């Protein structure tokens, strides 16, 4: 039996809201049903399981993150684009901490849909790296480095690891991204010789 107005997209959006409000650990199909004012069993007409729903929620969050990053880098290139991407990445991770955590827990290598999504998330990074004189394969390496630096920083920041020192966090993040940019310039200069 289908509840009027209930569909997979409604479930995904309501699930994202619940995850953001209460965290991943507190999420349940029962809580989702209560939020939507339906019986828990009616949810399974739209999704096979909670794992399937979490995959869909993660994919939606990945899409949201990608859209935010592409908007941030629009009209920018070179170093300005890298800094804009990095700021967008960090802003998303802080504003949507539980969804970001869900994204990072998705087993990207085990499912073709998830692997395609992982490739999709590399798109903004690959786009900003086109502004440097490095080959396609090296760009793949550099986007991993850039994403690794951004993720490492926001993960440690979220865990409170940076709260022990009275130095400006913004400057620390800027410095981390500048190190990546310096490496890009060094490699690009070597390629231009």
Stretch-by-stretch model annotation:
Residues 30-34, 43:
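Append "Primarily bacterial transcriptional regulators
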Residues 56, 70-99, 110, 134-136, ...:
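Hydrophobic alpha-helical connector segments
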Residues 108-136, 140-145, 155, 171-182:
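Amphipathic alpha-helical packing segments from all-alpha helical-bundle domains
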Residues 92-112, 155-163:
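Amphipathic alpha-helical segments used for helix-helix packing
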Residues 19, 53-61, 103, 107, ...:
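Alpha-helical DNA-contacting segments of helix-turn-helix folds
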Residues 1-6, 188-193:
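N-terminal intrinsically disordered/low-complexity leader segments
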Residues 102, 148-166, 182-190:
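Amphipathic C-terminal alpha-helical segment
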Residues 8-13, 20, 25-26, 37, ...:
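An amphipathic alpha-helix adjacent to DNA-recognition modules
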């Amino acid at each position: 039996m289908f509840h009027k107005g209930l569909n997979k997209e409604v479930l995904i959006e309501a699930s994202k809201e619940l995850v953001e409000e209460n965290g991943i650990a507190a999420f349940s199909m029962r809580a989702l049903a209560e939020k939507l004012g339906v019986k828990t069993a009616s949810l399974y007409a739209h999704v096979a399981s909670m794992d399937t729903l979490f995959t869909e929620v993660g994919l939606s969050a990945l899409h949201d993150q990608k859209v935010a990053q592409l908007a941030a880098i629009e009209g920018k290139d070179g170093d300005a684009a890298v800094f804009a991407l990095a700021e967008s990445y960090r802003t998303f991770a802080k504003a949507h901490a539980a969804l970001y955590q869900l994204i990072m827990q998705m087993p990207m290598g085990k499912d073709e849909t998830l692997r395609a999504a992982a490739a999709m998330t590399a798109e903004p990074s690959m786009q900003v790296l086109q502004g440097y004189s490095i080959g396609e394969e090296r760009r793949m390496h550099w986007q991993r480095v850039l994403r690794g630096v951004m993720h490492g920083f926001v993960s440690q920041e979220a865990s409170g690891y940076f709260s022990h020192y009275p130095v400006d966090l913004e400057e620390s993040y800027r410095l981390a991204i500048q190190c990546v940019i310096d490496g890009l310039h060094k490699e690009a200069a070597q390629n231009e010789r």
